[in-house]
Amino acid sequence: MSPQTETKTGFGFKAGVKDYRLNYYTPEYETKDTDILAAFRMTPQPGVPPEEAGAAVAAESSTGTWTTVWTDGLTSLDRYKGRCYDIEPVAGEENQYIAYVAYPLDLFEEGSVTNMFTSIVGNVFGFKALRALRLEDLRVPPAYSKTFQGPPHGIQAERDKLNKYGRPLLGCTIKPKLGLSAKNYGRAVYECLRGGLDFTKDDENVNSQPFMRWRDRFLFVAEALFKSQAETGEVKGHYLNATAGTCEEMMKRAIFARELGAPIVMHDYLTGGFTANTSLAHYCRDNGLLLHIHRAMHAVIDRQRNHGMHFRVLAKALRMSGGDHVHAGTVVGKLEGEREVTLGFVDSLRDDYIEKDRSRGIYFTQDWVSMPGVFPVASGGIHVWHMPALTEIFGDDSVLQFGGGTLGHPWGNAPGAVANRVASEACVQARNEGRDLAREGNEIIREASKWSPELAAACEVWKEIKFEFETIDTL
């Protein structure tokens, strides 16, 4: 950093620039149960010591600025400052470190992910002394998490609403994602739900475009829901995307969905913003609506391993802000996601208590106390041959969502839904009988296809489809 210069005054104030580490690097500090803890992967500029870089992260994301200021003397910096309390080198990487920072709870507004992120992942990410900076994990203490409502309903309450237990829930994103008229869209929804799926879904970029205005879509989808429910005797849902250009318009769409009797709405929580998402989550709890969350834009933030923010942090933020489902990758499909890393943040979404486990990318033990859990949604390039692996990886408390893997069936949408339902129930039955899904998965699907022509046709179409690319963001 710049050389230290000071100018004394008659009031005990020393103007000038000081090294950050003089005040913000405190390896002797013992963290408190009420601290928010952060693990940053940092790459300092050449010549910047890691202790100075870690202290700069702590300072610039809490009380510090680049020079000493008069008003430091009007408050207690020791009470409010962030502290870099540990630094460790990243194995196998040159000039890269994990900096651990503790933040006092009083720095953050209660119940506001927006305020928390404005500090922790704010201007510090553009700091010139750092070549790159990534927030790897966050420990949210119960003293802070209890100020959030969290998911509108949670896993158990949703199962009770749907009266569906003991298996993953099945969904489908309607394709093509853009261009269908509202009536044809509703027809596709009806066919998929009648065929055996639990949910259908608006694609994340379906809002209210000229080819299909939101109100028309909501009306035709509601008709499809009620017709499929009457024919199957099962509760059905369609994720009606309420995301809009303003919070007021978003709420208008959610209110209309509730008036139609729809059980669930949807929000793009990153493009829509945390303030809008939390507002919608509160409305959904108050009015009995489930809330499906899409993570559009996440890869802009989380895919590069040296800079940005890991999705496990975005997942924790979503659980606090509120959502009953959130997309979480597939491990086996077309989208990025390493198995152990994915399971690490899936546990952070579903479980009450998650132990520190660096082999899964979990830097801190996280205690959610009584906050409801979130269904992870596996979606993106998956089909019936993936069903055993998906069931084994994600378990029952998940939503498995097949868009092209339903609508691409050679016989049509309803047979595509039948194929997925048959494959899912075959995998659940085989697992419950003690069979090894990882080893016997293909055999289980082949056996089930002998008595399901819909599944047999799907198996033939997608037998050669694989997405075998190396994951970029690895541990």
From Swiss-Prot:
<keyword id="KW-0601">Photorespiration</keyword>
<feature type="modified residue" description="N6-carboxylysine">
    <location>
        <position position="201"/>
    </location>
</feature>
<dbReference type="GO" id="GO:0009507">
    <property type="term" value="C:chloroplast"/>
</dbReference>
<keyword id="KW-0150">Chloroplast</keyword>
<keyword id="KW-0460">Magnesium</keyword>
<feature type="binding site" description="in homodimeric partner">
    <location>
        <position position="123"/>
    </location>
    <ligand>
        <name>substrate</name>
    </ligand>
</feature>
<keyword id="KW-0456">Lyase</keyword>
<feature type="binding site">
    <location>
        <position position="204"/>
    </location>
    <ligand>
        <name>Mg(2+)</name>
    </ligand>
</feature>
<keyword id="KW-1015">Disulfide bond</keyword>
<dbReference type="GO" id="GO:0009853">
    <property type="term" value="P:photorespiration"/>
</dbReference>
<keyword id="KW-0602">Photosynthesis</keyword>
<feature type="binding site">
    <location>
        <position position="379"/>
    </location>
    <ligand>
        <name>substrate</name>
    </ligand>
</feature>
<feature type="binding site">
    <location>
        <position position="327"/>
    </location>
    <ligand>
        <name>substrate</name>
    </ligand>
</feature>
<keyword id="KW-0503">Monooxygenase</keyword>
<keyword id="KW-0488">Methylation</keyword>
<comment type="function">
    <text>RuBisCO catalyzes two reactions: the carboxylation of D-ribulose 1,5-bisphosphate, the primary event in carbon dioxide fixation, as well as the oxidative fragmentation of the pentose substrate in the photorespiration process. Both reactions occur simultaneously and in competition at the same active site.</text>
</comment>
<dbReference type="InterPro" id="IPR017443">
    <property type="entry name" value="RuBisCO_lsu_fd_N"/>
</dbReference>
<feature type="binding site">
    <location>
        <position position="203"/>
    </location>
    <ligand>
        <name>Mg(2+)</name>
    </ligand>
</feature>
<dbReference type="InterPro" id="IPR036376">
    <property type="entry name" value="RuBisCO_lsu_C_sf"/>
</dbReference>
<keyword id="KW-0560">Oxidoreductase</keyword>
<dbReference type="Pfam" id="PF02788">
    <property type="entry name" value="RuBisCO_large_N"/>
</dbReference>
<protein>
    <recommendedName>
        <fullName>Ribulose bisphosphate carboxylase large chain</fullName>
        <ecNumber>4.1.1.39</ecNumber>
    </recommendedName>
</protein>
<feature type="propeptide">
    <location>
        <begin position="1"/>
        <end position="2"/>
    </location>
</feature>
<comment type="similarity">
    <text>Belongs to the RuBisCO large chain family. Type I subfamily.</text>
</comment>
<dbReference type="InterPro" id="IPR020888">
    <property type="entry name" value="RuBisCO_lsuI"/>
</dbReference>
<keyword id="KW-0934">Plastid</keyword>
<dbReference type="GO" id="GO:0004497">
    <property type="term" value="F:monooxygenase activity"/>
</dbReference>
<dbReference type="InterPro" id="IPR020878">
    <property type="entry name" value="RuBisCo_large_chain_AS"/>
</dbReference>
<feature type="modified residue" description="N6,N6,N6-trimethyllysine">
    <location>
        <position position="14"/>
    </location>
</feature>
<keyword id="KW-0479">Metal-binding</keyword>
<dbReference type="GO" id="GO:0000287">
    <property type="term" value="F:magnesium ion binding"/>
</dbReference>
<comment type="subunit">
    <text>Heterohexadecamer of 8 large chains and 8 small chains; disulfide-linked. The disulfide link is formed within the large subunit homodimers.</text>
</comment>
<dbReference type="GO" id="GO:0016984">
    <property type="term" value="F:ribulose-bisphosphate carboxylase activity"/>
</dbReference>
<feature type="binding site">
    <location>
        <position position="295"/>
    </location>
    <ligand>
        <name>substrate</name>
    </ligand>
</feature>
<keyword id="KW-0007">Acetylation</keyword>
<feature type="modified residue" description="N-acetylproline">
    <location>
        <position position="3"/>
    </location>
</feature>
<feature type="binding site">
    <location>
        <position position="173"/>
    </location>
    <ligand>
        <name>substrate</name>
    </ligand>
</feature>
<feature type="active site" description="Proton acceptor">
    <location>
        <position position="294"/>
    </location>
</feature>
<feature type="site" description="Transition state stabilizer">
    <location>
        <position position="334"/>
    </location>
</feature>
<feature type="binding site">
    <location>
        <position position="177"/>
    </location>
    <ligand>
        <name>substrate</name>
    </ligand>
</feature>
<dbReference type="Pfam" id="PF00016">
    <property type="entry name" value="RuBisCO_large"/>
</dbReference>
<dbReference type="GO" id="GO:0019253">
    <property type="term" value="P:reductive pentose-phosphate cycle"/>
</dbReference>
